[in-house]
């Protein structure tokens, strides 16, 4: 089986390394400098010290990725629609499975990643690959556990069989929407938790904030799906609780580190400048705006997401923001 991975950032490169022992892997980047660097050194500047195996073929032209059996998308959510359109223009075959490893909500439409793919590539089956996974550990082939969410049980079982390895434990879920909501919101919550930790408000406040975060996941899920309950396996499994624990407790998390800098800066932190200077994508920054707008559209209250949004986009005071987190 040949798998194409779209996006050669830290996450995409890590997945390529992780799967290279069992699959033929194509790693695509739109960035010519990145392409030339990886081709020359077999190393990514996003994952220094991790050699990219020779059986990972690096490509610059997206048309060279379309003959794979499955495609894993590891691009920023805000770029997903553009990449899907490029594949559509390359006549991607309809039986090629799209596996989404990106997390977020599209700002312009307030759609989840699977909804974007269904619009642009309606004939391709979609699955979600999500859970607690730091890129550097995945690249080193350390053990990790993820959820593979798909509405087609047969396809889900097939993909798990192909992707699962000795160090990768995959759990099947049919809750495509719930898994994506957890994946998107946890980055916003990580920024909030980083602020609390940066302000040295203690682990009691931190734990309370993580607990409140799970309630906001539930609130958005119920409103978006018009359901009366959320799948408990989603809420307490790797995709939600597992990812929250990891992303909201370790400074290896880009989003937590971003929030920590805000909390420890004594109101002197320039979020926009930090984003423009950094090499990493802070998905929680974009998702805070998307989540706030989606909550407004659905007429629901999501106080943590709203507080992070108002701090980052409307210059709310850090004191007012923290009062929401610990109140």
UniProtKB/Swiss-Prot annotation:
Catalytic activity, as annotated: sn-glycerol 3-phosphate + NAD(+) = dihydroxyacetone phosphate + NADH + H(+); sn-glycerol 3-phosphate + NADP(+) = dihydroxyacetone phosphate + NADPH + H(+)
GO CC annotation terms, alphabetical: cytosol
Residues the record lists as binding sn-glycerol 3-phosphate: 103, 131, 133, 186, 243, 253-255
Name this protein carries in UniProt: Glycerol-3-phosphate dehydrogenase [NAD(P)+]
PROSITE patterns reported in the protein's UniProt record: NAD_G3PDH
Biological or metabolic pathway of the protein: Membrane lipid metabolism; glycerophospholipid metabolism
InterPro entries: 6-PGluconate_DH-like_C_sf, 6PGD_dom2, G3P_DH_NAD-dep, G3P_DH_NAD-dep_C, G3P_DH_NAD-dep_N, NAD(P)-bd_dom_sf
Localisation: Cytoplasm
Record-level GO BP terms: carbohydrate metabolic process; glycerol-3-phosphate biosynthetic process; glycerol-3-phosphate catabolic process; glycerophospholipid metabolic process; phospholipid biosynthetic process
Entry annotation: catalytic residues: 186 (proton acceptor)
Residue ranges that the Swiss-Prot or TrEMBL entry lists as coiled coil: none
Source organism, top-level taxon: Bacteria
Gene name of the encoded protein: gpsA
Residues annotated for NADPH binding in this entry: 11, 30, 103, 135, 254, 281, 283
Organism this protein belongs to: Wolbachia sp. subsp. Brugia malayi (strain TRS)
Pfam families per UniProt: NAD_Gly3P_dh_C, NAD_Gly3P_dh_N
């Amino acid at each position: 089986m040949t798998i194409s991975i779209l996006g050669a950032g830290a996450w995409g490169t890590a997945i390529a390394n992780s799967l290279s022992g069992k699959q033929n892997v194509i790693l695509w980047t739109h960035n010519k400098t990145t392409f030339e660097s990886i081709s020359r050194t077999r190393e990514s500047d996003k994952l220094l010290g991790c050699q990219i195996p020779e059986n990972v073929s690096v490509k610059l032209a997206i048309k060279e990725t379309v003959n794979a059996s499955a495609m894993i998308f590891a691009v920023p959510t805000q770029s997903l629609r553009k990449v899907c359109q490029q594949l559509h223009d390359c006549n991607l075959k309809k039986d090629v499975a799209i596996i989404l490893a990106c997390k977020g909500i599209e700002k312009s439409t307030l759609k989840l990643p699977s909804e974007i793919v269904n619009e642009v590539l309606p004939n391709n089956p979609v699955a979600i690959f999500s859970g607690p996974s730091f890129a550097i550990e995945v690249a080193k082939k350390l053990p990790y556990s993820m959820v593979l969410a798909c509405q087609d049980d047969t396809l889900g079982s097939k993909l798990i069989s192909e992707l699962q390895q000795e160090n990768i434990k995959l759990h099947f879920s049919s809750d495509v929407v719930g898994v994506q909501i957890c994946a998107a919101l946890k980055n916003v919550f990580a920024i909030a938790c980083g602020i609390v930790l940066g302000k040295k408000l203690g682990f009691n406040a931190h734990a309370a904030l993580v607990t409140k975060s799970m309630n906001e996941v539930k609130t958005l899920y119920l409103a978006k799906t018009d359901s009366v309950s959320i799948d408990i396996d989603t809420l307490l499994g790797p995709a939600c609780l597992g990812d929250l624990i990891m992303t909201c407790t370790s400074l290896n998390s880009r989003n937590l580190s971003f929030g920590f800098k805000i909390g420890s800066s004594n109101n002197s932190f320039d979020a926009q400048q930090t984003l423009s200077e950094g090499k990493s994508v802070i998905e929680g920054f974009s998702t805070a705006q998307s989540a706030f707008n989606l909550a407004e559209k659905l007429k629901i209250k999501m106080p943590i997401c709203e507080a992070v949004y108002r701090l980052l986009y409307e210059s709310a005071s850090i004191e007012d923001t923290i009062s929401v987190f610990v109140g």
